[in-house]
Amino acid sequence: TGYSFPVEREEFLFITSPFGTRQDPLDGTKQQMHKGVDIRCKGDAVLATENGGKVVAVNQNKNTPGGKSLTVEYARTDGSKVQCTYMHLKEISVKVGDTVQAGGRLGTSGNTGTRTTGEHLHFGVKNIYADGTKRDIDPAAYLAEIAQKGHIKLQMLHNGNDLLAKYKAAEDTVPEKNLSPDGWMKK
């Protein structure tokens, strides 16, 4: 279909930590901004989310906060770009400069890095506007767009709540169906 979620699931992605401010999992006395979602995984293939993505970064050093990680960039017609970052990987199957397609295998989930408490995929999304401004966005907003365009019927569940619901609700009440994740973030 040209669209995929970052891991394959039958019904839902189990989110262990959503986007936003949280208690630091490694130091409970501190708050931190979590710039992604943590998806429960166990040796899962991690997948490209759209067609025509370009691998723009690969980190094979497991002794960094995000461990083995990679970033795929997708260009938009308005000159902006979306970057999807996958962290804590066990293994990476792509190299910088590779072009990837939706559902294509990028690597395998793992537990690498100095900022992890167990195996999971940290999936982060960043908008880069045409003027070069960068902004971390809620991956649920981005994946709601992917779900809509790709007719993907999965949920992203955290504590029993579907994190996609607020973005799906917005899609049903707005006549303009092609809102960007950033457009949803401003609602």
Residue ranges and their predicted role:
Residues 32-35, 49-93, 114, 118-124:
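Zn2+-dependent peptidoglycan hydrolase active-site motif and core
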Residues 36-38, 102, 107-108, 120-126:
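Active-site scaffold segments
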Residues 98, 124-187:
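Acidic, glycine-rich catalytic/binding loops that coordinate metals and/or anionic ligands
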Residues 14-49, 73-74, 120:
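Short glycine/threonine/proline-enriched tight-turn/helix- or strand-capping micro-motif at secondary-structure
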Residues 1-4:
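Non-catalytic extracellular/periplasmic "stalk"
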Residues 46-57, 94-109:
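Short, well-structured beta-strand-loop connectors
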Residues 17, 41, 57, 88-91, ...:
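A residue-level detector for short acidic-glycine micro-motifs
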